[in-house]
Amino acid sequence: LDMQEIKSLTARAAKRWGEKIGLVFDEWNEQLSFQEIEDRSNQIANMLQVLGVRYGDRVAVMLRNQPEFPLTWLALAKLGATIVPINVNYKEYDAQYILHHSEAIVIVTSQEFLSLLQKIRPSLQTLKTILSIDQSDDPNVVDFRAMCETAPTTPTTLPVFPETLVNIQYTSGTTGLPKGCMLSHEYWLTIAKKVVEQHPHLTHSDVLLTAQPFYYMDPQWNLLGAIAVGAKLVVLDRFHPSTFWEKVRQYGVTFFYCLGIMPTLMVKAPRSPLDRENNVRTILCSAIPPHLHRELEERWGAPWYEVFGMTETGGDISVKPHDHDRLLGTGCIGKPDKDRTVRIVDVHNRPVSRGEVGELLLRGLGMMDGYFKDPDATCAAFQGGWFHTGDLVRMDEDGYIYYVGRKKEMIRRSGENISAAEVEEVMKMHPAVQYTACLPVQDELRGEEIKAYVVVKEGQVVPPHELIAYCTEHLAYYKIPRYWEYRSELPRTPSERIAKHVLANEKADLRIGSYDRIDDSWR
C-alpha cells in the first residue's frame, strides 16, 4: 500500500473489485459494491462542493450506522475537508459544544436529530447548512438524497496531501471537555497498512464485522482495511450480545475487533450448540479479561489477540501470533508495533527499571497532529517529543508490556496505590457478576476509599457480604471496596468502556445509596 491519501484507495478498489460487495448494512438491509462506494462518495463530494464546502472546512455528521455516514466520511476525505463525528447520544450541551468548537459549516443528520439541532442552531455562528438524509418539511433543512441524485459521479480533482486532516475526532474523555484529535490521511493509512501488511494480514477473502458506531474510530479503520484489500465489511447497528455471534455466522465473518466490556458480555450470554459453527480466523481485542481469555477461545474456536491503541495514536502495541499461546490469559498486551517506540517513566519523566510500573509514552509514525484549537493540551500531551498516554504499564525482562491501569484511575488508600482495574477484574470472576466499576471516594482518614458499582447477571441476587467475602479471598485487605452499589446497567462511552466520569458526577456524595462495609449499613 503506497497510497498517500484515501481517495486513491477507493479509486483503486473500484478498479480492482468493482462489482464485488464491499459494504453491508445489516439494520438497513443495504449493500454496496466497491464501484458504488466510489460513485456515491464522489456524488456526495460534488454535492458538498456545490454547497460551498472547501479544503479544510469542517463538516459534522450525526447519524447512526447508516450508509451515508461512511460515504460522507470518504467524500470529505476526497475534498480535503474534515469530518466532525457527533455522538448520537449527545444532548444539547455536548452537541452545541462540539459544533461550536469545531466551527462546522455543515451538518449531515437525520430526522431523528433535527429538533435537537434546531434548538441549538441559533447559537452556532458558523453552521450554514443542515442536510437531512430523510425528507423534511422544514425549509431550512436541505434534502441530502435529492441533492446527491443529481450530482455527478466524476472524481474530484482537488489536491489532497498525507498531512491533510480527515477527522477532528472528539474523545469521549473522562475529565474535562472533549478534545478534538486531528487525524490526517497519513494517520488512517498507517493503520490500514498495518492491518494488511502485519497481523491480522487482511485479504480480499476476508469478511469483517463492526458493531461499534461510526462516530467512533474503529469502524473507520475497519472500512479502510476492507477497501485496501477488497474485503467485505458488515456493519451492525450496534453491539447486541445476544445476537452478535448469530450475525457472525449469518455473514460468514472471518475477522472482527472488539473492546471494553464486549467480551465479558459475550461470554455471559447463553451458550449455543452453534457457538463453534463460524468462520472466524482471528479476533483483535483491547482489554481481554485475562480470566476469560481461554474460555473465549475454547467457546468460539478462534484465537483472541490483545491490541493496545488510542484515538490519539492509532495502533501501538499488540500480541503477535508467535507469542499467542505463551501469553494466553496473562494480561500481556504484547510488544510495540514496527512503527512505534515506547518509554515507561515515573512521575518525574525518568525511565523506570524493568518490572517497575510507570506511565507509557509513545512515539512514531501516523499519530494525531494534536488537539484542535488547544495548543496547551497538545504541548502537555507531547511533552519532550513523546505522547503521554496516561496509562500505567510495566515491561518484563523480555520486553513484553503488561497493562496496569489508567494513571487517573489509581486509588490511593492509606498510602497504598490500588489499581481499579485489578479490583474490577477479580470481582468479574464471581459467577453472578456481569460487570463492575470501581471509583475512589474521598475519606478523611484514609485519603480515599473504594466504591464498587456492580451489575449482576439477570435473575441473580448477590448480597454485599457475599461479594465482600469473595474479595477477601482473592484480594489484599486494603483493596476490598468499602462502598457497594447495585445497578441494572452502567453508563458507557462510545468505545464500550464504563463511563466512570458519569458515575463520579452523578451525586455530590458517592456514599449515598451504597452499602458501607465498615459500618455494616446502607447509607
Task: For each feature predicted by the language model, list its residue ranges.
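A short helix-loop-beta submotif of the ANL/AMP-binding
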Residues: 58, 64-84, 88-92, 100-106, ...
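Conserved AMP-binding/adenylate-forming core of the ANL superfamily
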Residues: 2, 19-66, 70-74, 91-96, ...
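ANL superfamily adenylate-forming
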Residues: 114-162, 270
